[in-house]
Amino acid sequence: MKIDSFLLKKYLIPLGQKDFIFYCFKRILYNRETDSTILQNNTYSELMTLKTLSNFKPYNSTTKDFSDSADLAADIPGYAVPLNALLKLKSVNRNVDNSRFLNKLLFTAYSFFDEIDTIKQLMYEQYTFQGNNIKNRSSDSVLVDNQLAIPKILKEAESHKVIMINESHYDWRHRYFMTLLLDSLFKKGYKYLCMEDLENEKAINKRKFPTSDDGYYIKEPFMANLARTALHIGYKLIEYEDTTNDIDAYLFNSPVDKREYYQALNLYRQYKKDTTSKWLIYAGYSHINKLRFSLVESSTMAKYFSEFSHVDPYSINQTAYCDIFNTKVAFDSFQNRENYYYLRKNQIDDSTLLKQSDLYIINNIHNIPYEKPDTSKSVQEYHIVYNRKKNEKASYVEVFLKDEYFQNYHAVPIYIKKFSGNILNKNVWLPKNNYNMIVRDESDKIIFQSDLQ
């Protein structure tokens, strides 16, 4: 329910019960349950701050709660402005308890620029990771040269109706892997791609390309290209996020339990419309677990979906051994080329993991594909060249499919790169097409654009 700020201040808060929940924006930025007497004097000012994001200032006197400020910063449209706002928060934050929450938002903001190394550095600054044990490891090397993941998955796909694959929301390599699977799986009968956090399902299926209005994670180029490629092949994209707000929260053990339940229910309602086709479900982290979500949460989307549909999904896990979180996974570089591999069950020394998912993926990918020479007939070399002018604050360059961009200025770039000096001179290898190059400043304003040659 949309509540006018005047009504909220004058009527709902003074007359409300001790505890209530209020919502901000056209979609939920945060839910907060608190004592109405505390909010009475502060809420109106806070809502005014929500309406003036362009003037966002960390620790604004009207946004006293740190998490609210961080959420607001992360949700600002664009790429450079939200990242810079979060970095400002980080520079003034002295509270250890806030750091973990803030870093999660920073990881996502950096992921939009596909900066895995920066994310890893932030991770290592904050945590000491202890990776899962892998048997038969010699000098911390994993010998998986003959264990290529894609052929294994395609073989398993023949005998399953539903495949669930997870990702880290910070890792473009997981989205690229999913994209590599799409064409072959489509030929095996998989017709639907269900994506976490997807919005505007009807619009994107009709438009046939993604925009930044279609979800939060889809702003990242590889996630956008996953959706774009699926639509081009012939998949129908399905949204399944829980949008029930907190109307019936009392029925569930926790917010996690509620979200897992409704995600699964939304998937099942779609699935039962076409049980003859096969389905791909793409989700983050623990949603695809078959045993439990975490040490303290037993419910998962995969478990609920199985209960509703009586279908046992084939669960593929990319996060348990992801090198962003796990420092114990290393490859024998003399035997393994850049590729995606899977672990045999006798290589996993963790009985819980064996129950959580059916297959564990590790990747030996280090370079963004577009930045590597490619002699394929369908690929062409393009040149990105831009010299910063004096006193110019050029921040990053975007490359758009020209047709998409001029149909909708909210189209998502196929490639994005931050400036690291005064000159950006880079060759990229992209599918043959017409592209538009745009350079933006620190305020996400366009300062230069041209066709990409």
PLM regions: where:
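Compositional signal for N-terminal targeting/processing segments
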Residues: 3-453
